[in-house]
Structures are given as structure tokens and as C-alpha cells.
Amino acid sequence: MGTAYLSPEPGGKSFVAPGDKVAAGQTLLIVEAMKVMNAIAAPRAGTVKALLVENGQPVEYDQPLAVVE
């Protein structure tokens, strides 16, 4: 369990938005768990179709966070 953040700092620009093209390994968002920030990377190059979480939302292990096609 952790907390999802869509930008690198409070009030900052989001890592990505729906419609953005991303490269494999590019950071989509971060999840804070036990005070450690974990970057969540795009599994492949493509287009961000949706972000399935909101900024500051609690998330669970194996929960879908974004759609990249």
C-alpha cells in the first residue's frame, strides 16, 4: 500500500497526461510507500490513454495505475 503522486513535487507539473507519447522506462508517476518514493515507469513506448489514479490517492499492490497503448 502507498500513495500515488502524479508530479515530482507538490504543485509541480505532472509527469504525464492522457494523450502524451512516452518512451519505455519513462516515469509516469511515483508511489510513496514507507517514506520511500518509487518511480512507476512505462512498460513500453506508446501513448498514455488514461491515468487510473488521482494525485494523493492511496493505492494497493497490483492495482492498475495507468493505461499505455
Report residues per predicted region.
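Structured functional modules or segments
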Residues: 1-69
